[in-house]
Structures are given as C-alpha cells and as structure tokens.
Amino acid sequence: MRRCLYALVGILLTASYASLPSYAQEMQWEDYAPRSTLVVEENPVTSAKYPFVDAHAHQRRIGEMSEAQVDELVAEMDALNMAVMVNLSGGSGEDLLQKVENTERYAPGRFVHYANIDFDTVDDPDFGEKAAAQLERDVANGAKGLKIFKSLGMEITYEDGTRVKTDDPHLAPIWEKAGELGIPVLIHTGDPAPFWQPQDRYNERWFELKQYPNRKRPPEPSWETIMGDHWNLIRQHPNTTFISAHLSWLGNDLGRLGELLDEMPNMYTELGAVIGEIGRQPRTAREFFIEYQDRILMGKDSFAPEEYHVYFRIFETDDEYFPYYRLRHAFWSMYGMDLPDEVLRKVYYKNALAIIPGIDASLFPDE
C-alpha cells in the first residue's frame, strides 16, 4: 500500500512539473531578465543638462551623407543636447577631406574629424616619417586629432611576424608630430582584462565571450604587457596630449587609473562603452570624477540615442538600481553619482574645448 502511495505521489509531481511552461522548467542564463520590484524615486534624463561634446564617436559614412541624412543626425544630436560629435573614423587623404567638406557644408561646426594611420607599409624604414607627413597634410585638410585603433599593439605585425608594439620607436615621429601640431591622440589599446582570463563561471565577461568568441585573447602577449606598452608610449612623449580610450580599461580599478593620471599630466581619458563600470560604484566614482575633473571627457563610442540617457542619469542624478542597456557589458544595475555642476561642465564640454582644437566655443555656455 505504501509503495503504491509513493508511486502515486511521484506520478502527480511529474505531471505537475510537466504542466509548467517550458521557460519555467529550464532557462538560459542570458534569458533571465527579472523585473525589479524595488520602489524608489526615478529621474530619467533624456537630454544632458549642458551641451556636450561626444569625444568618442564613429561616423564612417558621413562623407557620403546627403543633406537630409546629416539633418536627421543633427536633429538626434539636438534632442540629446549634443553640441559637437567627434568622428574618430575620419580616415586620411581624400576620404578625410570629403568628410570634412560634407559636414561643413551641411552642418558647420557640429562635427570634428580625427585622422587615422594606415599601417600597411609599416615595414618601410621611413614609415614613421612618412606617416607623420601625411598626418600634417590631414591636419591642413581639417583633421583636429588622431585616432589609433586597437589593431596597433595586438594585430599589426612586421613581415617577420613580430608584433608592432604601441611604443615601438619606429612610430615615434607620428606622436612627436601630433604634439608639434597641437592635436590630441585618442588611442584605443587592448580590451577588457577578462578577455585574457579563463572563460569560466568566475569571468565577468563570460556572456560577451559567449556572444563573440573571437574576442577571447591568447595568454601572450598578456593584458598587462599590451597596456604597459600603451602607458609607456604616453610617458615617452610628454609634449603630446593622449586620450586613453575606454578609461584605459581601468574603470574597475579607478585607484590605479588615478595613479597613472597623477604620473602623466599629458594623459586624459574618456568613457566610451565603460559607463557600466562607473554605475556600479557611485561613491568611489564620484570621488574620482571630482578629483580628476580636468582629465575626463564624455565619450560614448556607438551612436544609439537612447543609450546616452543612461550616461546622463549616472552623471546627473542620485537614482538607485536602474537598468543598463547591454547585458554583455553589465549584468548589474546602475546608480547615479549626482555630480556637481562644475564637474558636469568639465566632463561635458570644458575639457574637450581645452584639448581639441577648432571646436566652436560659442555652442557652449560662457560660464
């Protein structure tokens, strides 16, 4: 009798479990998206308190845009209170000139373009001097800065397969020329450190590596080696202004980033694609922003208007536990820093005006 009763209970439990919707029985981690029951004050921000310069943007096809397309882009910028967009994908030569002319024709003063370096002929013994000369021509054609992509230091090699390091002396004429011309070098080196770590349950970027397996990096050269080359480059050229992209991949270690900023007064940084790191440490980050308020620039990286709202909310409010927009970057919730107005002004536009030549200052408040 007892055996029959146990069997009946087992059948009922099995039937009950089987009747559950499939998503209640089993779920992939990335599908889990609970809706918070927390009831707190909410202050969404859809337009920045002050006009801002986006110091890290990419508009690769802007030279081909029609007047209507440029107008549409400018309207989206206006809705965000973005006064100036810095296009880091300016290219070089005729490509750059076309972008400069097109934006000045349809939206004067609203776009700034950085030149880029073509490393295809890096084996040429005179490569550094030739690249520096091309940079000078690009600046004469309207470039206001130089952007270096992460391929330098990780992917670009000499013919013999040797990695071209960021601080390779062969490239020194480029950085010296930038300093001579008075333009900043925004340089993206490396990737988040977890890309070099085991892809296991302890890795904060596990989901991103699952989505993009090609982002997983081999152990050598290590993250420390690659980023060490980057910081050494900045040390070697104290008369050149460098903007270390993505918080130098130290948004998770602001103390170390602060030490580097203390050591190298020619180093600035920006927030492209790393605001999720700031939003999980509001008190530490607020102290950092106040201490280094003269060295941080607003930057976003990809242009998706609604995503800027998260940046504004983190900067301008003290809101608690609100969502980020991309799970692979941050599976945690955000908190606002409620930055002082003077810090906001510097991050939004004053620091950019100080180091990027040619920005129209009349687009910003006098104070």
Question: PLM features: residue spans?
Answer:
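Acidic-and-aromatic substrate-binding clefts and catalytic sites of carbohydrate-active enzymes
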Residues: R60-Q69, N87-L97, D120-E129, I156, ...
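Active-site gating/metal-coordination segments in enzymes
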Residues: E26-W29, P34, L96-P213
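Hydrophobic faces of well-ordered beta-strands that scaffold small-molecule active sites
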Residues: V53-A57, V84-N87, V112-A115, L146-I148, ...
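H/E-rich (His + Asp/Glu) clusters that bind or coordinate divalent metals
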Residues: P218, E224-N232, H237-E367
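Bacterial N-terminal signal peptides
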Residues: Y6-S19
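Alpha-helical scaffolding within the catalytic cores
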Residues: S36-E41, A68-L73, E94-T103, K130-Q134, ...
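An N-terminally biased module of ancient metal coordination in phosphate/nucleic-acid-related enzymes
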Residues: Y23-G109
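Acidic (Asp/Glu)-rich catalytic clusters
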Residues: P44-S47, V74-A79, Q98-F111, A133-A143, ...
